[in-house]
Amino acid sequence: MGVLVLTSAVIGFGSTARAEEAGPPDKSIEQRFEELDQEIRILKRKNELGQEAAETAKKSTAVVKAGNTGFSLESADGQHVIKLRGLLQADHRLYFEGASDVRNRTDQRAGDLNADGFHDAADSWLARRVRPTIEGTLFGKYDFRFTPEFAGGSASVVDSYIDARFDPAFKVRAGKFKSFVGLERLQSGADIKFLERSYVTNAILPNRDFGIAVHGDLVGDRLNYAFGLVNGVSDGGNISTGAEFDGRHEVTARLFATPFKNDYSVLNGLGFGVAATYTDAQGERNLNFTDTSAADATRNGLPSYLADGQNVFFRYSSAAVADGQRLRLSPQAYYYTGPLGVIAEYAQVRQDVSLTTGGSPAGGGAGSNTNITPNTNKKLRHDAWQVAISYLLTGEDASFKGVKPKQDFNFGSGWGAWELVARYSEINLDDDTFRDPTGTSFTGAYADLSTSAQSARSWTGGVNWYLNQNTRVALNYSHTTFDGGAGVGTSPINAAGTNVRDRPDEHALLTRLQLAF
């Protein structure tokens, strides 16, 4: 018994000694959980700080993009964007028959004329459009666009405007821009189905102008409206960026409805509307209009008209000036369903024109047409219309905004998109244009039947090959007939108009290689 007590005492003493040597007891489970939770909180906060830093860096880093729609630099929040785009068109014009109207021009500019007073239409290569574009958006709603033109041997500004999108139903555009008038004109130059636009667009309705316009979309984007106040241009005119010379403004208005837009209906591709312009136009006098070309700014307020092959077939007399009201009206429509597309337009212009005393000397130089001749003011009415049809053989959907091939061209894997196009377009000039103010003589008129035709009618057919969304090869064949003048030769028209002959027909083959991005 004594031995057991002694042994227990020894063991107890040893255990106590070891416990004292081991130090304080282990931490409780609660303490360890608290320490672990604290470490997790620290790591979580570090992760949050890293994410915040990454988000801050992301918000301040611009996004660079490159693709088939161009090149862009965009702020991280998408509120500020600048884009670089371009349009290049290389054309060839081949004339099987036709005339280049250079009559009534100085020898220095025209050279020697044939027995009929014409040069044959000249075959040529040309750069039709060379247009780099800088466009973008500031603060998410202020769009801008700047497009110069380097084709034609000189530089000019095509577009230069700001478009403030305050609301889909209320936008304000200011600067130089396409007038909200012609349907075909509002189609991009890269998306038009033919190499050249119709007589409605190129001859009657305005091209670009300088001013301000309010526009927008109503009724769920089913009704588009536009009202503008612009400087005003002659028929088919493209205003320069300089100051206006006559101080009068032109009012433009357009309503266009797409009532079945976004509906699952065969009519969802139908659009129709009407546009108009009005001004009181006063042309400048004492200018040498005879020596001007169709590309010159006709500051007499009156236009020259081009045939489908881009040769002048009508010009006013050098003594004629715009002198009063000018009203244009244009009903218009399009229809797209599947691969089929149709555009139809009509336009009429009513222009007050007067004759002036004198005119440019035969040898050129400053004119003496400084005074309006009394009782010569006359309202002349010209009109034009067109119907154009397109059909995509490869089954893509036709649209107002161009074609995107189902398959890009690649040997062995795809042939792009193929499209057939056909158009009939004509323009008719007021009979009174070619008579004197009394209406009894063909001499002393507002235009001369020996150099100008009364009407032009063009049949155009062609094919478009879209290699991809950016590249197109186009081929057009155009046949234009002229009625009532411009074929009389070098002899002036007589008072009775008995020696009027029609201008020779124009047969032209036009080709184009286009790159747009």
Positions of predicted regions on the chain:
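Bacterial N-terminal signal peptides that target proteins for export
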Residues: 1-3
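N-terminal periplasmic/intermembrane-space "pro-region" immediately following the signal or transit peptide
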Residues: 6-7, 13-89, 95-107, 112, ...
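Helix-centric, low-specificity signal for extended rod-like, repetitive segments
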Residues: 25, 34-39, 122, 190, ...
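Residue-level detection of beta-strand scaffold positions
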Residues: 40, 51, 80-82, 169-170, ...
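A short catalytic or substrate-binding loop motif that flags glycine-/basic-rich loops and adjacent residues
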Residues: 64-65, 205, 324-325
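Outer membrane beta-barrel
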Residues: 69-282, 381-413, 417-435
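Outer-membrane beta-barrel pore domains
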Residues: 118-119, 266-268, 276, 284-517
